[in-house]
Amino acid sequence: MGRFIFVSFGLLVVFLSLSGTGADCPSDWSSYEGHCYRVFQQQMNWADAEKFCTQQRKESHLVSFESSEEVDFVVSKTFPILKENFVWIGLSNVWNGCRLQWSDGTELKYNAWSAESECIASKTTDNQWWSMDCSKTYPFVCKLIV
């Protein structure tokens, strides 16, 4: 009986130490502030990248940003591995006429505009957002709510 309690306590300690460390994210995804992020190096147009993100996991879309700290985290993941200067982010007016919104439906609270257009790419070297032709192909970042 004592051994069972010891093993059970050990498993509880391991479980508690893993909670909040990214253990809730799928493998190959990075955790930040209750969300998971993954950089995909393959190049797609905006619509295909958004579709690809939604097919990865339920509640996954092209990345949306709520703060400059979140942008800095994503840049820290994208800049070291990408050779491209731009990545698609989830901001566009594809789904909602002229009103820009994130592909996951959230409203635009934080922005870092360089220009305005249908589909927005983030420049990996200076964190600015650029309007791009939606048919151009770039790597992209998916964001998953956990």
Swiss-Prot record:
Pfam families: Lectin_C (PF00059). Residues 1-23 form the signal peptide. SUPFAM superfamilies: C-type lectin-like (SSF56436). It is found in: Secreted. Expressed by the venom gland. Keywords: Disulfide bond, Hemostasis impairing toxin, Platelet aggregation inhibiting toxin, Secreted, Signal, Toxin. GO terms for cellular component: extracellular region; other organism cell membrane. Belongs to the snaclec family. This is Snaclec jerdonibitin subunit beta. GO terms for biological process: venom-mediated suppression of platelet aggregation. Its main location: secreted. Heterodimer of subunits alpha and beta; disulfide-linked. It comes from Protobothrops jerdonii (Jerdon's pitviper).
